[in-house]
């Protein structure tokens, strides 16, 4: 009688709705005047390089793995410690930005130009692109909603993931839904306009991991308010546990 192979497998991963939010939010500098919320959804802070250089001794600006440094001035040698650096440039200066060599990953926010062309150039250079979801109400053809949808549609096919700029809890949810739609090949515009929260809560752990590998972080100006609104909107996310995490910027 032929033997029957015995296949041993580990336990199936348990769905945890909280994992999608853990370490996702990045607190923008405007919130640093007040304490940044000590919350598992906060994965770091976004600070201007000029503030880092001027206030290097400030406790709020201590070097840390979670700090995103926005390049508003020329950096000294050596550059300050950072999880990543972010530069905002118009399309005509994109090539100069892509040629920068820094001691941490670079996030490139390019205003203007063809969305597809810019996204492909940033990814090909080994950097991380930015998707702005702060004006999704602009649904005109070629407007902000279309540009965000086009950028997120490409996100699943890139090698380096994207960084999102948002202002509200609704925009954070829309960004998550847009990334999931991109990974699934669904209509990203529809996902941004009418995000399916129930579907986000049902995501398999592998899908959560894939989503967070694409969505590196969501920068918000008022994280405490966003956290409170997210908890109200989606109670299943409110019990956020204690672990911290985030997308890999490398």
Predicted segment positions?
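Expand to "…catalyze enediolate/carbanion chemistry for C-C bond making/breaking, isomerization
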Residues: 1-250
